[in-house]
Amino acid sequence: PIDLVIHLAGIPSPVFYKLKPLETFYLNSELCKIFLDFSLRKKSKFVFFSSSEIYGNPDIKNIPTKETYEGRVSSISDRSCYDESKRAGETYTYIYKNKFNLNCKIIRPFNFYGNGMKKNDKRVIPQFFYTAIKKKKIFPFSNGNQTRTYCHIIDAIPQIINVCFLGKKFVYNIGNSNEEISAYKLAKKIKKVMGEKSIKIKNIEYPKNYPRNEPLRRCPDVSNLKDEFNYIPSIEVTEGLKMFKKYAKREF
């Protein structure tokens, strides 16, 4: 018997989903339906890994962002192949839950990071460490004012397990709501963690291979996790970056 199906397949890095938009859309939406049909046949639970990207660019009154926020997302941009296909995957999951009474849950991750990320990942933390190590430079895009909260995988995994096996609700944000930080300040933290004064921080324009219109802010409301599982993130950003530095120096 199969107790649980988790749909984790996808292309989450903006550089790569811009490069492969059709593959991205398929993985997040049509493959989701295939897995839902499989779960239905096997009578198993189903968990869809969605994304914080489904919220798009929330207005200030919706930050931190609750699961009930419906999103502000463009259907015709370089980011749409990812954002809208994740939304489609969520809709498929909702339909199977309601039409077929399938036991389903949706997880919306907010900027997980940690050991295992590749040097060519192109997302901000591995990218900043890679260029700091190889070029002694860190390049925040634009003015570097765009903010995120970063959740170390050590904090994320126990909550994923909790949601999969014990969660009472349908949709859960998983992330760290405590430390919203700009890309420029993140670069300064990484420079300090690296302990090398020779590392330069230089703002650059968005490269052509990077999707435009990225969200200006992203911060989750994790009240569902706090209420059900007494969730408190244990890894502060500085500590997490120190841990990632050891990994990056070894692997990058």
Segments from the language model and where they lie:
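Conserved Rossmann-fold NAD(P)-dependent oxidoreductase catalytic core, especially the SDR/UDP-sugar
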Residues: 7, 33-79
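Short-chain dehydrogenase/reductase
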Residues: 23-25, 78-90, 122-123, 149-150, ...
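Conserved cofactor-binding/catalytic machinery of classical short-chain dehydrogenase/reductase
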Residues: 4, 23, 31-34, 45, ...
